[in-house]
Amino acid sequence: MSRLDRSRYAALYGPTVGDRIRLADTDLFIEVTEDRSRGPAGTGTGDEAVFGGGKVIRESMGQSLATRAEGAPDLVITGAVVLDHWGVVKADVGIRDGRIVALGKAGNPDTMDGVHPELVMGPGTEIIAGNGKILTAGAVDCHVHLICPQQVPEALGAGITTLIGGGTGPAEGTKATTVTPGSWNLARMLSALDDWPVNVVLLGKGNTVSDESMWEQLRAGAAGFKLHEDWGTTPAAIDACLRVADAAGVQVALHSDTLNEAGFVEDTLAAIAGRAIHAYHTEGAGGGHAPDIITVAAAGNVLPSSTNPTRPHTVNTLDEHLDMLMVCHHLNPSVPEDLAFAESRIRPSTIAAEDILHDLGAISMIGSDSQAMGRIGEVVLRTWQTAHVMKLRRGSLAGDDRADNTRARRYIAKYTICPAVAHGLDAEIGSVEPGKLADLVLYDPAFFGVRPSLVLKGGFIAWAAMGDANASIPTPQPVLPRPMWGAARGPAAASSLIFVAPAAIEDGLPGRLGLATPVVPVADVRRRGKADLPENTATPDIRVDPDTFTVTVDGEAIEADPVSELPMTQRYFLF
């Protein structure tokens, strides 16, 4: 029997069990723990599905006679290393009707052993070569200010396929508060987003004690609420909003009271009263009770997230935040009270603790805060920069030895499955699993987390790193992230989802607005807690000294030690 050494096999088919892959230029490595592309127990080793001249996927060889009507997949991604919250495996990934059908071995069972019954390729099957590449779920940005439509291509180019947030454009309310308020604005924004290849979750305004005003927004397409201090996040407003959310089954995102005008963090937790809530920028630089909002990450009912400008803590983090705050919250640096408000939110001690809490899995999600103290194109990148810094500082996590699979699974969950679970989207998106929408991102390992090779939306290529369109082949420079056919109006809508409250479906919203994008209800999230967020369930004791702002986690004081150098930076970007 002919044999291949490990390096030759990897060159032909991609890495297999026991091979390690470096993530971009970080110090993080993942190791393949299972190779499903070789069939059960390796029964198909030697005839792995590979496309090209003289290769396997040809008529009566790797390609069978199966028609689409007989179940052949529409698309197979061959030999990709799937990195998800549940593991690191190599597999052929089959897609049909825009959804993942199986992870296994693709091929022709008439000529090949170990072919998965859902991955029998026929003449109607398209192929993407994932060999040697990393495949992840599309990112879910859980904190988006919809300030301008140009954010969408930036997001897609960074591997983001779902946007959770709100806004109406560059209005002062939107620039500050992630809210699409009222039925008229919701209808306009749903119509505007109908043509884009992204899934959408709009948040209505929760800062009111009027139940009917909140129900009106739910019937009009809001899939949850945002409570923001700029609209007045009082204990009464928190309680009223959560009462309606409990009845409607939707999530509430919280930006609490930085100035402690209506109460302190203890009062906010008392108003929440053990109910599920998504705490935005839990560290506090983005807003929230100063100086100790970070302590809410210890509560099991609080689903905590970060926004990316504080990820990770660097020597530049503090300096850029003051200017960002002034712009985003309509403050005047010549007014002493405005300056004090801004300075109260920027604390090196809590930013340093945020790093540690992410590595422990105590802060569970990362979003952007797009154009409102955050960058929509850097959610994925800054997540992995944080993981890199934490490995350097804290060493390998328990369970990691030759590679960093445990840490990688924890960090990828922060922008995929965890926000999907928090907002009731996980039945549809958030992971690479059969039955879910095929929102997938394919990376060359050297560019992992920096620049995707392909972004699939509902199983159709929407964005790609593409060379000169007038060239004779696809690869000549300049290679730029560009829209593909899946970003065109028809397939963009057909391949995406608009998530709304169940009340909107019951009220006939889809027919009333005439949207091309399928409209689906969010799942009831009111009984969900941090224990439901994969790989990010920790609830350590967190305390903040009110005088020095020193943070202790399970009794250990966290020292601020900002880094001066990061991976995934100048090696990849000119600016």
UniProtKB/Swiss-Prot annotation:
Its cofactor is Ni cation. Binds 2 nickel ions per subunit. The active site is at H329 (proton donor). Its main location: cytoplasm. It catalyses: urea + 2 H2O + H(+) = hydrogencarbonate + 2 NH4(+). Its EC number is 3.5.1.5. It is an enzyme of class 3 (hydrolase). Keywords: Cytoplasm, Hydrolase, Metal-binding, Nickel. CDD domains: Urease_alpha. The modification N6-carboxylysine is found at K226. One of its GO terms (molecular function) is nickel cation binding. One of its GO terms (biological process) is urea catabolic process. Pathway: Nitrogen metabolism; urea degradation; CO(2) and NH(3) from urea (urease route): step 1/1. Residues 138-575 form the Urease domain. Heterotrimer of UreA (gamma), UreB (beta) and UreC (alpha) subunits. Three heterotrimers associate to form the active enzyme. This is Urease subunit alpha. It comes from Frankia casuarinae (strain DSM 45818 / CECT 9043 / HFP020203 / CcI3). The gene is ureC.
